[in-house]
Amino acid sequence: MQTFSKLGFLCLLSFGLIACDQITQFTTTSNSTNQTKAPAVALDPKAEFHLFIDFQNANNAKIAALNHEIANVTQSGDIASLAPLVNKFSTEIKAIVKDLDTLPIYSAEILKLKEKAKVLLVTSAELISDNVKLHHNPSPEGSMALLQKRDILLKISNEFSQMNDELMQKYGPPPQP
């Protein structure tokens, strides 16, 4: 059970990276963290998509570093130090989602991608938190619930990837500075 939980946990961590890396799969990482915001009345889906990609690129390093820390602690077996790290991860995800809400995106197709990204981030954080709780209180019901949530996360991840791929083909990568 413990080996299964560790493998499941590491699998879940990879989904967090998938969510972030899907955007950068077609682009190189942007060195610029300053973003200009489009006017509220402008509906330029291409510019909004590029703004979304730049936002994702700017947050990839944060999420990847936290995922790496969680993976290291999980592999070491130090469950006591895992809970504060997962809380830190959840707090960071909430901050990213809050920042994502402030992006000036008004185009329906880009809004769908933005909302899917938010759901993906929140579900990933919930899944990691639930996995830590399951480590402390293992139960067959908890394991089944975790597997169901994992399946939901896989579905969301696939939908996000498909939407992102379609928009990347339609609008292309953002111009390099």
Curated annotation (Swiss-Prot):
Keywords: Signal. The keyword Signal applies. Residues 1-19 form the signal peptide. It comes from the Bacteria. The keyword Signal applies. This is Uncharacterized protein PM1805. It comes from Pasteurella multocida (strain Pm70).
